[in-house]
Amino acid sequence: RQAIADAGLSGVPRHRVEPARYVGMLEAHIEQGDWLESQDLHIGVVTSIVAIWQYKIVFEGVQNHAGTTRMAIRKDAGVALRRFCQRVEERFPEVCGERSVWTVGQISMEPGAPSIIPGRAEMILQFRDDDMETLLRLEATVRELVAEANAAGPCKASWETTNQNKPALMDQSIQSALDAGGAVYAPGKHAR
């Protein structure tokens, strides 16, 4: 209310959107990736908004002195995390979809000192797709890889879901209208 007053709009009646009058909304967007540019296209018709599924994966080992603990008896959580990341890169291409992407965008290790074997390592794994079956396959692969890490040892691995939303498929009639407009105003330079 204060912002409305500060803008000089106090007392101005509020206008409400009547949902029955609208099929959808359009949003002009600057491409954040390189797909349109790499294909020399001017217009891209959005078909969906991908879901983002995110997991925190934790490895528990034993913190110890890096200079005196023999390699054969180490329980290095950092090494366990590195192996897990490698397995993600090997396995995800086998189960992903054409548009799937994944990222390990955050890693932390405790205590985070160069001369101490990490006793705990944590990562955030995120993947995105617009197909629920693909998302479920990727999640099942995470579950399998955590079980595999626990079976291999020597560290204990656990995981928890931190974000899981649904893909949003765009209205087909709006896509078709935009596609038709692209054919007129950007022939050969547009795509869905």
Predicted features, each with a name:
Residues R137-A147:
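Short amphipathic alpha-helices in soluble, non-transmembrane regions
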Residues A80, T141, S173, A177:
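Charged catalytic carboxylate motif
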Residues R87, L145-E148, A177-V184:
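Solvent-exposed, charged/polar functional surfaces in cytosolic regulatory/catalytic domains
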